[in-house]
Amino acid sequence: MKMFKKIMAVALVGVMALSMLTGCAVTNAIIEDKAETALENAWSTEKNENVNFKSGKFTSKDAYTKTKKDVVNGIIKVEEGKAKLSTYSDANYTVVVVAEPSSAKKVKNWNGLAKTVLVTANWNNGIYVNGTNSKTAKVDIVTGIKGKNATEDKDDTYTIFVFAKSETAYNNK
């Protein structure tokens, strides 16, 4: 009976850990989706054309990894409502960092910030748009990155947008 209790305790700990891990992943996916929708809304409003932002997989790129490291180490800090172009952006990728808005699971809380992100990325010069009638752009949005607050010495949560800036990056699988 003692062995059964020990096994069940270990199983319970495993189940709880798994549920916590997947819960965070689901939350980040929701936030990323809302941010992506806000980018599409901002582009449509400002440029009067529809661009579908597709998810790219650019987190293995130097531009992203160096930017994330600087956010985590408190080197890059961004005030709420503003965006910062990463110095690690290069010929293929444009990297923009923002402080995550409160209630980031709602599109309306990303709307103003999405325009700021696009302006910081320099619209068409910093974001490769493919197609003529059905336009698409690729972005990798990573949320929930812990860093330091821009105005106070406390923790803050950041989101990093990595846009394909060139056709080469856009076609990169």
PLM feature spans:
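Gram-positive cell-envelope targeting signals
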Residues: 1-35
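Phenylalanine-focused residue identity feature
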Residues: 4, 53, 58, 161-163
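Intrinsically disordered, low-complexity segments enriched in small/polar residues
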Residues: 12, 21, 54, 79, ...
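Generic low-polarity alpha-helical segments
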Residues: 16, 63-68, 129-132, 173
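Intrinsic-disorder/low-complexity peptide segments enriched for small residues
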Residues: 16-19, 83, 111, 116
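Short, well-ordered surface patches within globular domains
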Residues: 26-93
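A well-ordered secondary-structure block
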Residues: 87-173
